[in-house]
């Protein structure tokens, strides 16, 4: 007679027997928050796109925090990590807003990688000018989409989403752009096209 699994083994066995989602991704749960379903649906879709890009930007900062080198190592090492913490707060706020509106927030790395508009960085270490250019490019994408999303949320009277985008996402990213750009004001940035052109190209297939 075989022994019945106990503890963690039992939990795994039960999970295998009942693998189901009680709230599928893309499905909206209605909540009594005095907003039309169509407005909630649009905000959820937009915020999930922004969530993917904010997670990617946060992780890009962490990569550069670990890999930065050169005479400005100490200052940038600390600055990048401070920005990681601030972006992490935005990630949490955006994801929770998605859930509040009745949606399902993106969470897993493969889903984020499939969704983000920010180009994937190489695995290896880059010089500081390339790191800075890559960060400013990512910020430009986030800011461009956040401004459009904020206007759309305001048009739908989704004041909570609009406030998050303006007071949280836009202001935080603007401030980080200032700190990063001014920190290396005398250092030439490395990029093949202007940041604005690159951001426009990345956003060209994203329809709001």
Task: Locate predicted features.
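Iron-associated oxidoreductase/ferritin-like identity signal
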Residues: 1-208
């Amino acid at each position: 007679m075989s022994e019945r699994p106990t503890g963690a083994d039992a939990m795994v066995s039960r999970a295998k027997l009942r693998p189901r989602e009680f709230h599928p991704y893309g499905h909206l749960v209605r909540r009594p928050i005095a907003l039309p379903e169509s407005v909630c649906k649009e905000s959820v879709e937009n915020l999930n796109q922004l969530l993917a890009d904010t997670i990617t930007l946060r992780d890009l900062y962490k990569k550069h925090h670990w890999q930065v080198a050169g005479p400005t190592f100490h200052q940038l090492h600390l600055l990048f990590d401070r920005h990681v913490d601030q972006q992490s707060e935005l990630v949490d706020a955006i994801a929770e807003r998605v859930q509040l509106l009745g949606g399902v927030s993106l969470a897993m790395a493969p889903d984020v990688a499939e969704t983000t508009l920010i180009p994937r960085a190489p695995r290896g270490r880059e010089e500081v000018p390339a790191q800075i250019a890559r960060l400013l490019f990512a910020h430009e994408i986030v800011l461009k989409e956040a401004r459009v999303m904020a206007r759309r949320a305001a048009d739908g009277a989704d004041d909570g989403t609009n406030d998050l985008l303006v007071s949280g996402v836009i202001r935080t990213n603007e401030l980080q752009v200032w700190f990063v750009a001014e920190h290396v004001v005398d250092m030439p940035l490395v990029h093949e096209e202007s940041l604005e052109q690159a951001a426009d190209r990345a956003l060209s297939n994203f329809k709001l």
